[in-house]
């Protein structure tokens, strides 16, 4: 399978061995699309990741192979968060899942900028969701960044007459503007 790997100041396409479950609990999914997150750009630009790293975590995928005690089946189109909160640390208990002390212990393997990734059974049980048929791959690719916007709005405890200001019209700014409009 092909992956887009960091190689110094470049990203190269590299052919690697196809992923297999080999008895592991989880799923091999075919990536239909992957968003380019600002964190991917920062990691690459500032050399935070090592050569060979495959970035990307905002995936839309189809399950190709599965070994899991969940309701997911081969052929299901899904989205999944890349990290799994522990739900037990102080941050998780206060609803700050993205600050989880164990957050970075889990990830999609090798990364969304590849033809396929492995999602653990923990991903499937906790942070993966089926995509309704009427939602396109392009629309659902905003699942993760839109979730960040909605979480921020919910934390602000806004009421319909409150005024807000969105600074910046990158993808997050545009999503935030649309989410604020939709919420009144």
Go through the PLM ranges and name each one.
Residues 4, 28-29, 165:
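Conserved beta-strand elements of the Class I
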Residues 19-34, 47-90, 123, 130-134:
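Glycine-rich beta-strand-centered segment in the early N-terminal region that forms part
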Residues 39-43:
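Cytochrome P450 core scaffold surrounding the K-helix E-X-X-R motif
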Residues 88-167:
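NAD(P)H dinucleotide-binding glycine-rich loop of Rossmann-like/cofactor-binding domains
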Residues 148, 172, 180:
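Hydrophobic/small residue at the entry helix of a nucleotide-binding pocket
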Residues 182-184:
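Conserved S-adenosyl-L-methionine
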């Amino acid at each position: 399978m092909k992956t887009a790997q960091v190689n110094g100041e470049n990203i190269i396409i590299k052919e690697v061995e196809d992923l297999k479950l080999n008895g592991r609990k989880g799923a091999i999914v075919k990536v239909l699309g992957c968003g380019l997150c600002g964190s991917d750009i920062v990691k690459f630009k500032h050399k935070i990741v090592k050569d060979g790293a495959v970035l990307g975590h905002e995936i839309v995928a189809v399950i190709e192979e599965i070994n899991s005690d969940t309701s997911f089946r081969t052929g299901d189109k899904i989205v999944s968060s890349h990290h799994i909160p522990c739900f037990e640390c102080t941050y998780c208990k206060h609803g700050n899942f993205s600050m989880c002390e164990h957050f970075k212990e889990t990830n999609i393997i090798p990364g969304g900028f590849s033809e396929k990734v492995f999602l653990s059974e923990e991903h499937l049980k906790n942070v993966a969701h089926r995509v309704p048929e009427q939602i396109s791959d392009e629309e659902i690719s905003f699942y993760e960044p839109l979730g960040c916007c909605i979480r921020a709005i919910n934390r602000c405890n806004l009421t319909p007459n409150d005024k807000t200001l969105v600074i910046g019209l990158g993808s997050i700014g545009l999503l935030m503007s649309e989410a604020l409009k939709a919420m009144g």
